[in-house]
């Protein structure tokens, strides 16, 4: 028997409790600009910490390999119904434990080792799981990569030529570091012309898509994968949306194909997040995310920094640091010392190594969640520029850190 009053983390494991408290302070006192990070609601976190973590539920609602699943069936069905409504999908699988496993599930269902896939080059803003040679997708399949044109937009004409030349079985759309809107309809036409499936990985853009401020790939793609965190502001996990005709294949690929028992506490948290995302408040939030990103990018340009693609049409932007003679690694460290959290990121055709890079990636979802508006976004842009102009000046770092402290105190994450 467990005594809730005594079985607290603080009592059971003081070392872990201390680390959690330190991380809480960091999140409250630092400005979070990593585009793939966000803050979940207390309701989402409560679902993840619920008794549902105790329940094994191999299978799917109404067809389980374990008894006692009548209530987790309700939870999973709610998650399925809500995410279908959110994106207008015919079918959904909410069991993938991550976005990478969602992608792997589609590959496992529809491809065989040695098949040809075509995806956006990691060097141009794609994702590891879209065919990078260091990932299983690049090891198991023959990969053809498309990228950006001279204007740093997706080179759709080159992608079309590659598709006709190589006849891929599956085309992957989506990116992890691309700021503009993706023409999913055009990519769908390319896929159809060569007899390929189209899979869209919308992990970065899912929250924006749910709110209608970014193009929805669901009407155009055979499969749409996503994480449930990032801009969607849910728990860490994955989802696959699909045409109804592929539901059985995808479900079998996830279980028993690549996963065993689903994480029911996480699926409950996904359901809560989907309900939050269906609200009018969430749409307003995403509109602010896009506006804050636009203001942040414009401010950086005014301060002499170059934004890859020249602008952002979403929540994310890549900053080219070469004109400032500073690497992404050094910029990440300097901004971190000022309590502004970013991640170093390669720019298109980056001459630096992946652990060094010539750029940083910035995103607006987390700062918007804590209440920042255009005025704060402009201030943050100027603070970033101040640090990048004097990355080794202790007085500048101290001044910016003090301004960050004042700003984060006015806009707490959790009251």
Swiss-Prot record:
Binding site for (6S)-5,6,7,8-tetrahydrofolate: 122, 126-128
NCBIfam families: PRK00011.1
Keyword annotations from UniProtKB, A to Z: Amino-acid biosynthesis, Cytoplasm, One-carbon metabolism, Pyridoxal phosphate, Transferase
Principal EC category: transferase
Pathway: One-carbon metabolism; tetrahydrofolate interconversion; Amino-acid biosynthesis; glycine biosynthesis; glycine from L-serine: step 1/1
A GO biological process held by the record: glycine biosynthetic process from serine
InterPro entries: PyrdxlP-dep_Trfase, PyrdxlP-dep_Trfase_major, PyrdxlP-dep_Trfase_small, Ser_HO-MeTrfase, Ser_HO-MeTrfase-like, Ser_HO-MeTrfase_PLP_BS, SHMT-like_dom
GO MF assignments: glycine hydroxymethyltransferase activity; pyridoxal phosphate binding
Record keyword Coiled coil present: no
Gene3D superfamilies for the chain: Aspartate Aminotransferase, domain 1, Type I PLP-dependent aspartate aminotransferase-like (Major domain)
Quaternary state and interactors: Homodimer.
Catalytic activity: (6R)-5,10-methylene-5,6,7,8-tetrahydrofolate + glycine + H2O = (6S)-5,6,7,8-tetrahydrofolate + L-serine
Function of the protein: Catalyzes the reversible interconversion of serine and glycine with tetrahydrofolate (THF) serving as the one-carbon carrier. This reaction serves as the major source of one-carbon groups required for the biosynthesis of purines, thymidylate, methionine, and other important biomolecules. Also exhibits THF-independent aldolase activity toward beta-hydroxyamino acids, producing glycine and aldehydes, via a retro-aldol mechanism.
Modified residues (N6-(pyridoxal phosphate)lysine): 230
Statement: the UniProt record of this protein carries the keyword Amino-acid biosynthesis: yes
Entry EC number(s): 2.1.2.1
Entry similarity comment: Belongs to the SHMT family.
Site feature: Plays an important role in substrate specificity: 229
Protein source organism: Burkholderia mallei (strain ATCC 23344)
Protein name: Serine hydroxymethyltransferase 1
HAMAP family named in the record: SHMT
Subcellular location: Cytoplasm
Cofactor: pyridoxal 5'-phosphate
CDD domains referenced in this protein's UniProt entry, alphabetically: SHMT
